[in-house]
């Protein structure tokens, strides 16, 4: 079975997920976001806190002021599930409801981002992600033969 290299890499050589696997990642991410919101609700913390902190992980984009490689690294460190997983583990072990709530917000944020197609970044720039290049024009170009 031949693999079409054009379906596996973008024009800059960065690999990305395409087709059905990309759709499954987006559906899975929506499920993570929903589960995180349900967990947050069960913890009984105020929704104003959820709203106030939901976009906090995006403060990592300030790293792009130091260049695309630093920006991508900082963004990716904050946008992988390992961070909130460690925090929720700490919350369970210590009995800290606030740690569990913060982890739920963080999980929800990452899931929501991935559901919308915002993936982990490559060092070439913010628009280059593991879920494809961001932007309507970029996606239209990659979809054409």
Language model regions located:
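N-terminal membrane-targeting hydrophobic helices
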Residues: 2-145
């Amino acid at each position: 079975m031949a693999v079409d290299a054009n379906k596996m890499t973008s024009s800059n050589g960065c690999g990305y997920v395409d087709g059905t696997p990309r759709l499954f990642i987006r559906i899975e991410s929506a499920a993570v976001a929903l589960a995180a919101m349900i967990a947050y609700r069960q913890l009984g913390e105020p929704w104003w806190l959820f709203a106030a902190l939901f976009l906090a992980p995006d403060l990592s984009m300030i790293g792009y002021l130091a260049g695309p490689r630093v920006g991508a690294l900082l963004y990716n460190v904050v946008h992988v599930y390992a961070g909130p997983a460690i925090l929720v583990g700490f919350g369970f072990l210590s009995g800290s409801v606030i740690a569990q709530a913060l982890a739920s917000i963080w999980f929800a944020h990452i899931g929501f981002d991935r559901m919308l197609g915002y993936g982990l970044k490559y060092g070439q720039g913010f628009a280059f992600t593991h879920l494809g290049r961001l932007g309507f024009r970029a996606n239209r170009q990659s979809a054409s033969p």
